[in-house]
């Protein structure tokens, strides 16, 4: 490996050029490399990396595979899961197709999720990102304001995605962003107002470009933009935006529209509350969203409408027990770490579900109900070594009674039982 020429000049160990022929030589243990070879190596690595991260249609799970994965974590909402699986599959297929030279360029289809509180909107979006192994970010629309006003700029949503992709911009450009509480940025009235609505219509206007696809300038540290600041450039054309909201009150708009169409002789008269919210949401039209307060341009950039139903008692009981990370399984694991067995009887599960329905909190309220009821016993267990089993009954939920507790005889503790088990295992081995 030549380091010197005959004139005792340093040479690049890779290309053989002398120090006079290059701008810079960098020394290593027994070797030298010039700036030109460094640039060449960087290009080769960048090209290879681009090939490895490039999306291939074959690597994107098929709609039925995506739905199967969603089924493992999300109970019910069959129609919504199918719609989302197809929409996500088509989105990533579109990314791959648009890279090729084709006559037809496929446009982006963002998704709007509508459903009552606690119906699983956020969980669906999070689970989609897991199955696809893409960066994911959640943003709260209520914190966003128009540029120049107190609050977060819309570009800060993109920063969260970049951070979750470990500042790999290229990977972030294929990610998913979930914007929650999107119904809270509806303008205050259907008719345009002369006063500025900086957290409603103003935010909708600010979101239009990034939803459609643009090269946005994002401050690396977040916050407001200011002159002489460096920006991260990110293209949002291939980012999938999923917007979600409860849209309280939109059911009345749908009901009024559907009522008008069934007036006259022979029309079937329905009671005022005959249809539930879930069924009404299935009949939603873009015009209903305009009446609710979303501007036409914003609705146009969310062409896929996916509605979720209110969860009934059976669905809530299944949510407590069936998913991979079901709440009952989580609490059993927590107790198991203290060598205590936890059991919920069927009546207790039914009572928890009924309480969640009464509170109108959906699946989100299940944890709060369990936590309220179990705080006292979880406080006692670590310091009471004689407790071995806890049973949650219907009375614990309805009458606020203490859970049933099984204890060891005097003089015995969970610690001594555990050490005896270890000794037996060692002896048998």
Curated annotation (Swiss-Prot):
Residues 1-53 form the ClpX-type ZB domain. Residues 401-429 are annotated as: Disordered. Keywords: ATP-binding, Chaperone, Metal-binding, Nucleotide-binding, Zinc. The keyword Nucleotide-binding applies. GO terms for molecular function: ATP binding; ATP hydrolysis activity; ATP-dependent protein folding chaperone; protein dimerization activity; unfolded protein binding; zinc ion binding. InterPro entries: AAA+_ATPase, ATP-dep_Clp_protease_ClpX, ATPase_AAA_core, Clp_ATPase_C, Clp_protease_ATP-bd_su_ClpX, ClpX_bact, P-loop_NTPase, Znf_CppX_C4. Belongs to the ClpX chaperone family. PANTHER family: ATP-DEPENDENT CLP PROTEASE ATP-BINDING SUBUNIT CLPX-LIKE, MITOCHONDRIAL, ATP-DEPENDENT CLP PROTEASE ATP-BINDING SUBUNIT CLPX-LIKE, MITOCHONDRIAL-RELATED. This is ATP-dependent Clp protease ATP-binding subunit ClpX. It comes from Clostridium botulinum (strain Eklund 17B / Type B). The gene is clpX.
